């Protein structure tokens, strides 16, 4: 069975817990409001950037590894924590590369927004909001957690999310955070 989130169960279909499967379900359920552009080139960019944020070895994956590292390295690990770390593929090689990979992805995303801005556009791709904009708005909280009133997280878990290295903090281009805040204000 599926024991991770998010999970979407729809009709009699199997539960979905992969970002792209959930996205494709949303596309089928409401084809008039596409989150993936219909233009082929933009579609490829949308899926590629979405993977860079959500997918294996993407921003979320690498930030999670960085978040787990101090706990795994500690002698005072919560019960069952290593099972969760193992489930998510925690390994020393990927952990050592997590910051570097995160920085690269943040630079790609900032560059894309700057490119769009020079063309008078306010979204990652094209002239309208796409999955990339929503994914960035959500996953950006792994780099800079929004205040509790905007992003409720259990007070005992907030320190885990707020423990962000200076390397990552320094890569948070203002254009990324302004975009996150605008998307959150306008769409959430």
Go through each PLM region and give its residues.
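Short acidic (Asp/Glu) and glycine-rich catalytic loops that position anionic groups and cofactors
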Residues: 2-5, 117, 160
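C-terminal alpha-helix
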Residues: 25, 29, 112, 182-186
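GST-like domain detector, emphasizing the conserved glutathione-binding G-site
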Residues: 1-81
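Short His-centered aromatic/hydrophobic patch
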Residues: 139-188
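Residue-level detector of alpha-helix boundaries and kinks
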Residues: 7, 11, 31, 87, ...
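Generic alpha-helical structural signal
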Residues: 20-23, 47, 103-107, 177, ...
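GST-like fold's C-terminal all-alpha helical module
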Residues: 48, 55-156
